[in-house]
A protein has these predicted regions:
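Active-site-proximal segments of metal-dependent phosphoesterases and phosphodiesterases across multiple
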Residues: 152, 361-376, 380-429
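N-terminal secretory signal peptides that target proteins for export/translocation
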Residues: 1-14
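Bacterial signal peptide processing site
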Residues: 32-34
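Active-site neighborhood of phospho(di)ester-bond hydrolases with catalytic His/Asp-centered motifs
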Residues: 126-128, 178-185, 234, 239-244, ...
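C-terminal motif of bacterial Sec signal peptides marking the signal peptidase cleavage site
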Residues: 28-30
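Active-site environment of divalent metal-dependent phosphoester hydrolases
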Residues: 188-190, 245-251, 363-364, 399-404, ...
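Core catalytic region of metal-dependent phosphoesterases/phosphodiesterases
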Residues: 154-266, 271
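Metal-dependent phosphoesterase/phosphodiesterase active-site architecture
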Residues: 37-118, 122-137, 141-171, 178-179, ...
Length: 561
């Protein structure tokens, strides 16, 4: 583990390797550019495939267990914890041909042809549920098979590979992404170090995914899950919503209270969960096969950076994260008021408004909710956008159908408000760890699309690229393209994808039907082309703004990889 808080031009001896520790901040501390370049080059970084690809070109598909292997699963002789046996038993992935965009005209029944002069209004990266894991934390719940992920220790690597892949797409395009939005569940255990790793993946720098003491289960740099590695960052403005994993113990096992905060910084397995059938468990960081420890008498080296963050601390950390934009949507007034919802104009100077909601309920459940104060605020934001004839994108961690029945404001009331605001075109969500599309409409012709994006923590480990295209004939086309991380075959992120596909075969997740057999249906909600009839006043207002890009990146870049 790198010495925390030390950024200099000196050499730190870590026992296994000499590192010159100079991340991006070193340029601000008086280090020369050559010193910085030398420092960063001394930290391994993980490469991508030779050629970029999206799910238009090829998709990773999980292997279905054979009848013999399924019998072993059923009788308990092959369990989800025996991940070293996954490949031997045929679990993993294979590549298949990509899937085209599936066109939907439900919100544009009279749409005939694309415009002859098209404008790209927004080029967006959507990320969901990275759930970065500190696998050595004593408050992990890996004794519960639904919580356990055989590649959990590789979540920093997967998220960085996802960002690295997106960065290559952005750099290959004629313009960078206008912005990125993470739709919640930034961390898995709500810990400070997990959030720090996620932020570094987005901003660039050195990620040291080790905690406790300096572990090096496989001697040498860049070859095991605890080795530091270099993140290149997205180089686009990014925003974030909160999810249940950011405000509850492992997403739903109790509040973040003083007992949990003390236990997280301790050295013994936490056994204080109120859930009688849920068992603690964490990964021993000195084991090459990342073995899970279930014995509460075994010591895991303590680490103060494992502190589970309060909502105020979480918002302050995001505000102070650096990178663009300043505050990432949050203000100091928001933080003081514990207000985790906001609105922004993510495409500078253009009439596109993004409203980011806080659908979490830190006191009750992992499901979604909304209070009366936020609902009133949302109503005012929508009225303001209508008055200014703006396009509106709504973001929340939970879909409307994932709200719980004790929410102060019901999902139906939120839906009714959004669906009667005719300039709302999209509701972007996460939480369910799969791709879904839901048409929210009043009469079958007016409404918006609710899109849930799959997680980067679980198979298929994808993000989404969205592009809003004005056809200049009264219609908007929304291109939705899924992108799996393009990790080179020998990288740890590539290994994580194999492990995630293996877990999928066991069906041990929180989501009904989340098995290999479900995959055939999952693909149908991946690449989409959504046609939307624009309100006349919004369409006219868009024409008042000049210098929209005329290159449609989805056509000219993504489809040509």
């Amino acid at each position: 583990m790198l010495n925390r808080g030390t950024v200099s031009c000196g050499v730190i001896h870590m026992g296994r390797l000499f590192y010159i520790v100079v991340a991006l901040a070193s340029l601000q501390s008086g280090c020369s550019s050559s010193d910085s370049d030398s420092a960063l080059s001394s930290v391994p970084e993980y490469g991508l495939s030779e050629n970029p690809y999206t799910s238009l070109q090829q998709v990773w598909v999980p292997n279905e267990p054979s009848a013999e292997v399924r019998a072993m699963m059923d009788d308990g002789t092959f369990t989800v914890y025996q991940h070293p046996q996954y490949a031997k038993n045929g679990l993993g992935t294979r590549l298949e041909e990509g899937v085209p965009w599936i066109e939907h005209r439900e919100l544009a029944p009279d749409f005939l042809v694309q415009g002859t002069q098209r404008s790209s209004l927004a080029y967006i990266l959507v990320l969901a549920d990275p759930q970065i894991i500190d696998e050595e934390s004593p408050i992990r719940m890996d004794g519960y098979a639904n919580v356990y992920r055989p590649g959990g220790q590789l979540t920093p690597h997967v998220f960085e590979a996802t960002i690295r892949t997106a960065r290559r797409i952005s750099d290959t395009s004629s313009r960078p992404f206008d912005f990125a939005i993470i739709v919640g569940d930034l961390t898995d255990t709500s810990q400070k170090n997990e959030l720090d790793w996620m932020i570094t993946a987005l901003n660039g720098g050195v990620i040291d995914p080790d905690s406790g003491i300096d572990d090096d289960p496989i001697p040498g740099p860049g070859n095991d899950y605890n080795d530091p590695f270099l993140a290149i960052g997205i180089e686009s403005p990014w925003y974030a919503a909160l999810g249940n994993h950011d405000v509850l113990h492992v997403g739903g096992f109790g509040a973040i209270d003083s007992t949990l905060r003390d236990a997280a910084r301790g050295d013994r397995l936490f056994t204080g969960s109120n859930f009688s059938k849920v068992w603690g468990g964490y990964v021993a960081g000195d084991t090459a096969d990342h073995e899970v420890v279930f014995d509460a008498s075994v010591i895991t080296p303590a680490d103060p950076d494992r502190l589970p963050l309060s909502e105020t601390e979480l918002l302050q950390t995001l505000y102070d994260a650096g990178g663009a934009p300043a505050g990432h949507g949050f203000s100091l007034d928001d933080i003081a008021a514990q207000k985790a919802y906001y609105s922004v104009y993510p495409v500078a100077g253009k009439p596109i408004k993004m409203i980011v909601l806080d659908s979490t309920d830190a006191a009750v459940t992992s499901l979604g909710s909304m209070g009366k104060m936020q609902f009133s605020w949302l109503h005012e934001e929508l009225l303001g956008a209508a008055d200014k004839r703006e396009l509106v994108i709504v973001v929340s961690h939970h879909r409307l159908e994932d709200f719980h029945d004790k929410s102060e404001v019901s999902a139906q009331r939120v839906r009714d408000l959004l669906v009667t605001s005719d300039n709302v075109i999209l509701h972007l969500t996460g939480h369910g760890h799969r791709d879904t599309k839901m048409l929210q409409t009043v009469n079958g012709e007016e409404g918006f699309w609710e899109l849930m994006t799959t997680s980067t923590i679980d198979f298929p480990m994808q993000s989404r690229v969205l592009e809003l295209v004005d056809e200049h004939n009264g219609y908007l086309s929304i291109y939705v393209t899924n992108v799996g991380h393009n990790s080179a075959a020998t990288t740890l992120a590539s290994k994580a994808r194999q492990l995630a596909a293996g877990k999928l075969a066991f069906g041990t997740t929180f989501f009904d039907g989340d098995t290999v057999a479900f995959w055939a249906e999952e693909v149908k909600a991946q690449n989409l082309l959504l046609r939307v009839a624009l309100p006349e006043d919004v369409s006219r207002n868009l024409e008042n703004f000049s210098d929209w890009p005329d290159t449609v990146e989805s056509i000219d870049t993504l489809s040509h990889f």
